[in-house]
């Protein structure tokens, strides 16, 4: 495991133990989608129930649109779910732990703008 991977694992483990982890509905859906085996689906669903669900409001969607436009003006197209995750993180002043390359590019632009940790 690389140093970066170890750091992310430690950060995530600490955040879970401290109950600082939240997810939004679209992440829950994305993680569960495509699991064909009913038993595996139910096990993962139960595991995800341990995480607080951060409710989405009109503000989050409007903020996502604003951030999308900002990223686009910097030459980057962000996916709808990726930029929604960023909007929630900006509003909560929260960090995002991810290995998703598309989301990481969005985060880089928003960090450069001083909007994300």
Question: Can you describe what each PLM-predicted range is?
Answer:
Residues 11-13, 86, 90-117:
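Acidic, PIN/NYN-like endoribonuclease modules and their adjacent C-terminal/linker elements
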Residues 50-73:
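Acidic catalytic patch
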Residues 1-23, 33-46, 117:
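Short, well-structured N-terminal submotif of metal-dependent ribonuclease cores
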Residues 55-58, 80, 98:
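Short beta-strand scaffold positions
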Residues 20-23, 49-55, 95:
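Short loop->beta-strand "edge-of-pocket" segments that line small-molecule binding or catalytic clefts
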